[in-house]
Each structure stands twice: as structure tokens, then as C-alpha cells.
Design a protein with these regions (language model features):
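Canonical Rossmann dinucleotide-binding motif of NAD(H)/NADP(H)-dependent dehydrogenases/reductases
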Residues: 2-34
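Short, small/polar-rich loop/turn modules that mediate ligand/substrate recognition or access, typified
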Residues: 82, 180, 185, 190, ...
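Catalytic Tyr-X3-Lys loop
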Residues: 85, 106-125, 140, 144, ...
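Substrate-binding pocket helix/loop in short-chain dehydrogenase/reductase
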Residues: 97-114, 199, 211
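Active-site helix of classical SDR
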Residues: 128, 164, 172
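Alpha-helical segment proximal to the catalytic Tyr-Lys
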Residues: 133, 177-178, 239
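Residue(s) in the substrate-gating loop at a strand-loop-helix junction
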Residues: 148
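Short C-terminal tail/terminal secondary-structure segment
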Residues: 153, 213, 231, 242-256
Length: 256
């Protein structure tokens, strides 16, 4: 894809799943990739796959809730590759201790709300604040945030998570609206149920069947499905696409 070969992208949450898939896809297109994650062993595994196939990538340990570690991620990327051309925000707190206690407005404890918003929403604010000045300085750049199909209100549970993702949709539009004229593109992908590491660990057959029944396709999502659209949005092939939220979920949002 145009505008990827030789350019550098930060994957903020690239140890597994969609982030790892996007890192590998970008590298296969000739891009330099900085894979950041709190799970440094997972990030290193992603990088080993990339470099083993001749790609260029580094792994950096960072935490979406820690502004200093985000600065370290940016600094490490610049030290290794000399520039930053795009950012893919994909990390979130999907731990059983947090997401597993995220249910309804009456049942979800405030500590779950605080943790969810601090990581899922403010984490993206922090990474954008760290990267955006670099993109503005060079007059171009693309940001792709990871929202969720749940932000559309189709999930009766996980209220804090879905609210954080709905706010990400607004954050995405804000960046496009305020900085688009300065060469910055900001879009979001809203995945349906993607069978990555978290879903495989939770193994919620009832949820899987619910999404599959609502889908207008014959399978659930794979990380590669999201990696393809994210890579496109980061590339110059999508240079006239800005401020959009893309639902990628087999049309499972189209309820009967």
C-alpha cells in the first residue's frame, strides 16, 4: 500500500490480537514498527516474528496509564527509526479482574469505572498527546484508534468498557476536526467479536453464538480482518478518509 514502505508506525498495544496482527501486516508492507505493550514478552514475540521474516521492528514496554512510559515509547521509536508517521491505539484493560466485573450501571463498582476510563480512554489521550506534535511538525500523519461495536449500544453489559469506547469515537472525530487541515488523519475501527487471545481465554460460548447469530456472515472475526482495514487507514491509500468510525463485524450490528 502507498505510504507504508520505509515509514514508521507505533502500535500502542501490539503484544497479541489485533495489535500484533496490524504490526505484522505493516511490516509486511515494508514499514518500520514500534510494538509497545505492558506485556513485554508478547511484544517481543511479535517483533521476533516480524524480524524473522526480514521486517524491521522493536519492542518497548509501556503502560497506557503511565505518561512517562508513553514518552519512553516515543523516544525509543525516534531513536531507532528517526521519525513517526502514524499511531495505532489498540490497547485496553481486558483483564478478568476489570472487564469481568464490568456489568450494569447499578452493579459496576466505581474502581472499575476509574480503571477502565484511565486505561481505555485517557490512555489514548496520552498517546495522542505524545505523538501528535511530531505529526504536526512534519505536516502529515495518520492515527487509527480501536473502538468497539459495543460503543453502538448493542451490548447490554460491560457498560464502563462501552462508554470508554464511545468516548474514543468522539476523540477520533475531535482530532480529525481540529487537525485535519494540518495534514492529520484520525479514524477509528469498531470491531465486532474478534477471536483473539482474550476471547479464547474467556471462552464464552454463549456470547460467541449470539454474535454469530446476529452476523450476516458465516464466522466470527479474526485479528487479520482488523489488521487489513487498520493498515489501509494508516496508509496514504486512505488519504481522503478522516474522522470516520468503521464498524468491522460481519454486519452483526444490524439487528433483526
Amino acid at each position: 500500500m502507498r505510504g507504508l514502505d520505509g515509514n514508521t508506525f507505533i502500535i500502542a498495544g501490539g503484544a497479541t490480537g489485533i495489535g500484533a496482527g496490524t504490526a505484522k501486516r505493516l511490516a509486511s508492507e515494508g514499514a518500520n514498527v514500534a510494538v509497545g505493550d505492558i506485556n513485554i514478552n508478547g511484544a517481543k514475540a511479535t517483533v521476533e516474528q516480524i524480524t524473522g521474516e526480514g521486517g524491521r521492528a522493536i519492542a518497548v514496554e509501556f503502560d497506557l496509564s503511565d505518561e512517562e512510559s508513553i514518552k519512553d515509547l516515543v523516544d525509543a521509536t525516534l531513536a531507532e527509526f528517526g521519525a513517526i508517521h502514524g499511531l495505532h491505539n489498540v490497547g485496553a484493560d481486558l483483564s478478568d479482574d476489570n472487564l469481568g466485573r464490568d456489568t450494569t450501571v447499578l452493579e459496576t463498582d466505581l474502581d472499575v469505572w476509574h480503571r477502565t476510563l484511565d486505561v481505555n480512554l485517557l490512555g489514548y489521550v496520552r498517546t495522542i498527546r505524545a505523538v501528535l506534535p511530531r505529526l504536526l511538525q512534519q505536516g502529515s500523519g495518520s492515527i487509527v484508534n480501536t473502538s468497539s461495536g459495543g460503543s453502538l449500544g448493542t451490548d447490554p453489559m460491560h457498560l464502563a468498557y462501552n462508554c470508554s469506547k464511545a468516548a474514543i469515537n468522539q476523540l477520533t472525530r475531535h482530532v480529525a476536526n481540529n487537525y485535519g487541515a494540518k495534514g492529520i488523519r484520525s479514524n477509528a475501527v469498531m470491531p465486532g467479536l474478534v477471536m483473539g487471545e482474550t476471547q479464547e481465554r474467556q471462552n464464552d460460548k454463549q456470547m460467541q453464538q449470539m454474535f454469530l447469530a446476529a452476523s450476516k456472515t458465516t464466522r466470527l472475526g479474526k485479528p487479520a480482518d482488523l489488521a487489513a482495514i487498520t493498515t489501509f487507514l494508516l496508509s496514504e491509500e486512505a488519504e481522503w478518509i478522516n474522522g470516520q468510525t468503521w464498524f468491522i463485524g460481519g454486519a452483526s450490528h444490524m439487528r433483526q
